[in-house]
Amino acid sequence: MKIRMTEELATTRLETPIGPLRLAANPEGLVAVLFAVDPQELPVSQGAARARAHLSDAGTALEEYFAGRRTSFEGLKLAANGTEFQRQVWGALSRIPFGETATYAGMARRIGRPSAVRAVGLANGQNPLPIIVPCHRVIGSNGALTGFAGGIPAKKWLLEFEGALPRV
């Protein structure tokens, strides 16, 4: 995912058990959570004061999540760009409870588009806010762990951490 740097955009780096994350926000809310980004690609930037406040809120929420003290990201101000269909899928992703999984076919049914399984998969893959909009909770119909921006090992770690998969 490419992020266009502007004077209003604020970014920060967050160390997590699954590797470093880069967060980006504008004055409207959090716009991206990126995995292992090259620092030259998205440098840390102060941005606008309101953007920094959104970064602080998101950083605290993610730290609480990884410490086992948060199971939901409700209340965070999100400002991700996407099509109406993508936003519909991302909204449905946000309703998958902590510790549970859903299939792509199940997600398509949830949004009232049962034949749109592939489109749901594509929208899932375009989610700019992984973890916060929990696309890692979507698995294949056969139970297989499929694509994730942070890689399959990170997806497996997150699902085990949430208790959705037995730890091996």
Predicted regions, residues:
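…primarily DNA-binding HTH/wHTH and HhH modules…
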Residues: 141-168
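Histidine- and aromatic-rich ligand-binding microenvironments
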Residues: 97, 128-131
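Active-site phosphate/pyrophosphate- and oxyanion-stabilizing loops and adjacent acidic/basic residues
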Residues: 60, 121, 156
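Basic nucleic-acid-binding alpha-helical/helix-turn surface characteristic of O6-alkylguanine DNA
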Residues: 1-115, 161-168
